[in-house]
Amino acid sequence: MQVLPPSATGGPSRLFILRPVATTLLMVAILLAGIIGYRFLPVSALPEVDYPTIQVVTLYPGASPDVVTSAITAPLERQFGQMSGLKQMASQSAGGASVVTLQFQLTLPLDVAEQEVQAAINAATNLLPDDLPNPPVYSKVNPADPPIMTLAVTSSALPMTQVEDMVETRVAQRISQVTGVGLVTLSGGQRPAVRVKLNAQALASLGIDSETVRTAITSANVNSAKGSFDGPERAVTLSANDQMKSADEYRNLIIAYKNGAPVRLGDVATVEQGAENAWLGAWANKQPAIVMNVQRQPGANIITTAETIQKLLPQLTESLPKSVQVKVLTDRTTNISASVNDTQFELMLAIALVVMIIYLFLRNIPATIIPAVAVPLSLVGTFAVMVFLDFSINNLTLMALTIATGFVVDDAIVVIENISRYIEKGEKPLAAALKGAGEIGFTIISLTFSLIAVLIPLLFMGDIVGRLFREFAVTLAVAILISAVVSLTLTPMMCARMLSHESLRKQNRFSRASERVINRVIARYGQLLKRVLNHPWLTLGVALGTLALTVLLWIFIPKGFFPVQDNGIIQGTLQAPQSVSFASMAERQRAVADVILKDPAVESLTSFVGVDGTNPSLNSARLQINLKPLDDRDDRVQTVIARLQEAASRVPGATLYLQPIQDLTIDTQVSRTQYQFTLQANSLEALSTWVPKLIARLQTLPQLADVSSDWQDNGLVAYVNVDRASASRLGISMSDVDNALYNAFGQRLISTIYTQANQYRVVLEHNTTATPGLAALDGIRLASSDGGMVPLSAIAKVEQRFGPLTINHLDQFPSTTISFNVPDGYSLGDAVDAITQAEADLAFPAEITTQFQGSTLAFQAALGSTLWLILASVVAMYIVLGVLYESFIHPITILSTLPTAGVGALLALLIAGAELDVIAIIGIILLIGIVKKNAIMMIDFALAAEREQGMTPREAIYQACLLRFRPILMTTLAALLGALPLMLSTGVGAELRRPLGIGMVGGLLVSQVLTLFTTPVIYLLFDRLGHAVRRRLPAREEEA
């Protein structure tokens, strides 16, 4: 048994060193808890930070944008505007559709928001049109959030109406029931219906108006209760043939009698099985299809939801005929899983590199095993806490663990190096462990809490960015805390059992060679340090110059919000002139699809034309382009987008806007491009004056690309100007006119066919094949009070005007959204500055208000809080260090190292052509924590040497620098190699990881060189300052 000297107290580590079994079992418990926790952690791309968002869709076929706005959107908005917790309300009123998107505060639970929305819809019901085919339908989904999965259903044998019916009843409903699914939409509009196409001439010749036909159909097709009777012995339920379910039945329906002879519907109309909406269409790789888009609820886990759907699909497709093919075209989880797997590989690579650098410096296998055990134990133990906090395995938490690899090994290295030093001096391993751990314990605590203090401000960041990085900060802090516990318990215990004087002295050729190199480096460093200490003011000038350069770089470096990721999916909008027809738009879509599918990087394409809850106008088409896997294509997504836009520009009469789909979605509206800027006014007239001026100005700016607006006020309008006096004299009301027009041209849903599985509509319209366009209005006849038929032209004149295709509101006021991209060579910060200057130059009137939206607004908020965040980190660290050192001055000495980290990170980002975005800023904040560790290790030993050995401050700091040079170099290289895999990342999601790695590697390289010289100089200067202050204070007291 080793006899312990009295000084070998061991501090907080003593109990764990002396009880190896208990220590081992405690560490095994941490390891098992982490392994079990890992199995329960969900996988996702990013932390769940969605705003609670609900979309309310109301369809009113045939209604103009003005009617939809006044009759549907406005009543709903008035009710929604009274809800508590509402953050923003945006609406879009188009021909036949109203879409209101409600975004609530982050703190409001989605279920509570849902209850408020339902209550508001109920309150607005009495204010909505009586002939509304369906009440407003809400979905817990963000319309700007791209689908997690897109499926294409095609058939070479069956009509699309029959395919849609099967998909809707057998597939879509079941998928909608999956936990996490917010909305399943079927694009293509081929829902079955009975279409009644009236022959205007036949009606006129028989003296029948369309309202008579409509009334006859609705009266003939009913599905209501008929009662029952209860006899003495039997109960009987009443039923009747009150339902008509096929086109043949409707064709034979008698609608009137003329001259005693029946007039059947087939005599005055073409009756056929068709689609409910003839102006909707979808294609998959140019083949007609039903495109099924699955969107998740805000907050739902993408991976879990998609995996459940994938398991369910085989069962669902078995119920479909063999001629119906279901193909998954888009599954976002594929790229998310690939990105997470790449990050996990980089984490393992970081661990391997860190262990390699430890062996390089320690040159001893037992000594290398000790920190090699500490690293995975600290990381795996973190998983247990992550489960408790409802975190997930995502890119940010894995990045935190990758960076933590370099952090957590630092504590173990410092402990091992100090214990090894005493063993090499001849101490027994147990005594050396107690003495070395006791001596270094305060340093470990200082390092740990000062590093965690850097992360504290991240926990208090507000809004979406704060939620995003909370998991990152907490995961890293937990790993660091577990590392400190391991370093003060397991590490010294293992040193006492595994290290010995003989093992440390046992060296091979490589060990001796590396030892000579390191000794030479230390000797050379000592010589340079002496020269630097002899020229303190010059060194101080270098430090101040570094600070000034950091400020300049911060001002001029390009700034962004969040890295643009290559997820292999491109979202597109095809825009055509505002008066384009459905047939013409479909043709242009096919021409653009031909161009897109010829690109070697494209794997598949889905497209959609028509107006529904996802597409606001007939002159726009939605496209989703799936690229080949990253390993199978030569170009990144931005290069592919530029190439596709160039090729599509040769298609006449259409403009293609493209943007890559991102994992982080902050917007609430589907936009043509990545960034949005909104104008809001009290009236549409004010917007119509200023929007064109601003668009014209922005399109000239080099900082912007693909500038467009959703302001569309040049749609063709046939204005029916009724002579009310003439109409009244003939007994014709405005209601009669509206009904006649609606019956003819509104694809009016006049009756419902009920079946056991679904409900189908009867659609009424005029057959305009023979008389297309405005000429069809000549066939409209209205019944007068004397029973005669009056042509519309007798009481009205038709004027051709221009009107809006869509009317947009933001928080109940008219608005328009300007969309833009940022071209190569410019940053989002440049674009924001350019737009702000253009707005100032135009000098908008007071009634026009402007605001950036979505990620651009988040960028402004993040940029405004960044300096405060860094300042808060510095202040938090100063407070912690001041408390630990019981000094006002020593924390300043430690914090003087920070500018060296900033200048290195900013220079590295500038050289790499990367922007200063929120990921890079997190890297700079972490550098603050890493770089100050060098100063802490120097100052701790210098203070101890002054206090215990009576050295002068110069001798003490000089000796501390030489003694701590090896662990400082080891810990810095460990942190650098931990960040290196992130910097060199090339796989899926690399865009997200590289800014963090670039900033940290650059900052560590520069700070490592500078702090080794600036810290001792500043330490001595502050020491002289402290002595001068202390000399003056007694003198003043004597004078007093």
Curated annotation (Swiss-Prot):
Q: List the disulfide bonds.
A: none
- State the compartments where it is located: Cell inner membrane
Gene3D superfamilies reported in the protein's UniProt record = Multidrug efflux transporter AcrB pore domain, Multidrug efflux transporter AcrB pore domain like, Multidrug efflux transporter AcrB TolC docking domain, DN and DC subdomains, Multidrug efflux transporter AcrB transmembrane domain
Q: Name one GO cellular component term.
A: plasma membrane
Q: Which Pfam families match?
A: ACR_tran
Mind telling me which SUPFAM superfamilies this protein's record contains? Answer: Multidrug efflux transporter AcrB pore domain, PN1, PN2, PC1 and PC2 subdomains, Multidrug efflux transporter AcrB TolC docking domain, DN and DC subdomains, Multidrug efflux transporter AcrB transmembrane domain
Q: Which GO terms describe its molecular function?
A: xenobiotic transmembrane transporter activity
| Topology relative to the membrane | Multi-pass membrane protein
- The portions of this protein that span the membrane are 16-36, 347-367, 369-389, 396-416, 440-460, 472-492, 537-557, 863-883, 888-908, 911-931, 968-988, 998-1018
Q: Record's InterPro entries?
A: AcrB_DN_DC_subdom, Acrflvin-R, Multidrug-R_MdtB
* Record key words, sorted: Cell inner membrane, Cell membrane, Membrane, Transmembrane, Transmembrane helix, Transport
Xref: PANTHER family: MULTIDRUG RESISTANCE PROTEIN MDTB, PTHR32063
Instruction: Report the family membership.
Output: Belongs to the resistance-nodulation-cell division (RND) (TC 2.A.6) family. MdtB subfamily.
Assembly notes: Part of a tripartite efflux system composed of MdtA, MdtB and MdtC. MdtB forms a heteromultimer with MdtC.
Query: What's the name of the protein?
Result: Multidrug resistance protein MdtB
